[in-house]
């Protein structure tokens, strides 16, 4: 199988590339022109990132990786998104996995930052679909990332793939993002939208940030601690992508979350046990709001009790279905 990936140097993209290569598949890394396709000191941006995180770069098995330059600003212009040689690498590919997007929690949400979050998701996805339309023998499947932020702050409501969207910034962002991906259906492509929960990984994503106060013995719940957290391990997230790539009967929305969401207070207690630290120092909601503003409301205090209904219907078997075993597994990763 030949799979084209955007966002290949991110947390999920790196792990997915590694997984596909181990099984002998070909990965085409779609790199925006001038955004890291060149090597520095013999390493790509993804390889440098992994070294900084204490990880080795993905090792090739029988598979291989090809890097292709892409100009994501040609949708309404006469220019070509790919050079002639790069275009050949994408023609005939089986699928595209769209994981591009600036970090949601990387910086506070100024208006400029919000614009970047939108452009790195909705705009890039629009340009991707437009570029695919220009191919003569393009991929037949688009697997595009989204997030459970789609649902907004919903208290104790049980959220399935059929639940209507919320109306805060993250919900609107996810709706815009997904709307651009759905346009690929007009090209005859099978489109799968993956709404990821909090991805647990030792060397990236939210977990290392969550662990910081615990390392200093001051960890605890956030706000009331009653808000629901829907999570998934990186291992399961990658396996879900692999399965929807291979199962051509799957299309539409899939919630990529474990079957047992937990309240924030319970998550804090489980994390404290996993790292052998107390979890008795709550972070008051007012302090979080003063420090982080809207981002605190949407990322730390919002409640999203999401269920993986589609995955359960498909018979997916989670490697780590409960939080305690998931944290134990994740924190012992090399």
Predicted region positions:
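Glycine-rich "substrate-gating" loop/helix at the edge of Rossmann-like oxidoreductase active sites
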Residues: 165-170, 197-204, 224-234
